[in-house]
């Protein structure tokens, strides 16, 4: 999946040069998301997983609460990245408001009305599932990524299937470290 994400991101970046300005901006914002969230964010989480696990396990709350809170925090971070990229539209060659990778340029609007508000019940559902099933952290990553892909398909149609690696990573990273931090 990671190799496919790398290949598709490279193709998107290469095709961005010939695309109309708004399309180019969206493609470059998407590629930037892959670099910042999937690449850099994923690498930092992987390198810091043991200290994070020790920290999270030291918090005196039920693990289900910690899982939901940690996944929600990571979803908020991911949306901060995407909203920032949307607000950087002029850096990508188009006026602010001409190209979006989020529902809005307003972070609070995005998280409270469009994304994280929808994710939290899904995180609660995963906490319930993890109480009864012993999924590995990698299985949680993949399965939640597929759930995210299905969600993106409800918004963007079958086109989202061609971006399956992107959506599996974007969503999977939100739950990988919380799942890794389980007792």
Model-inferred region functions:
Residues 1-183:
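Aromatic-rich, lipid-facing transmembrane alpha helices and their immediate juxtamembrane interface loops
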């Amino acid at each position: 999946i990671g190799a496919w994400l790398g290949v598709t991101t490279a193709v998107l970046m290469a095709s961005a040069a010939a695309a109309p300005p708004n399309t180019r901006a969206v493609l470059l914002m998407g590629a930037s998301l892959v670099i910042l969230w999937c690449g850099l964010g994923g690498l930092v989480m992987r390198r810091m997983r043991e200290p994070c696990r020790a920290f999270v396990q030291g918090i005196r709350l039920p693990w289900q609460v910690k899982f939901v809170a940690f996944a929600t925090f990571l979803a908020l971070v991911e949306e901060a990245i995407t909203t920032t990229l949307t607000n950087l539209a002029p850096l990508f060659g188009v006026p602010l408001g001409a190209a979006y990778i989020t529902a809005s340029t307003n972070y609070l609007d995005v998280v409270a009305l469009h994304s994280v508000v929808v994710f939290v019940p899904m995180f609660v559902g995963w906490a319930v599932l993890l109480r009864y099933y012993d999924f590995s952290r990698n299985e949680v990553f993949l399965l939640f990524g597929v759930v995210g892909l299905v969600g993106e398909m409800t918004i963007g149609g079958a086109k989202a299937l061609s971006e399956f690696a992107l959506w599996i990573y974007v969503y999977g990273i939100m739950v990988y470290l919380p799942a890794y931090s389980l007792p």
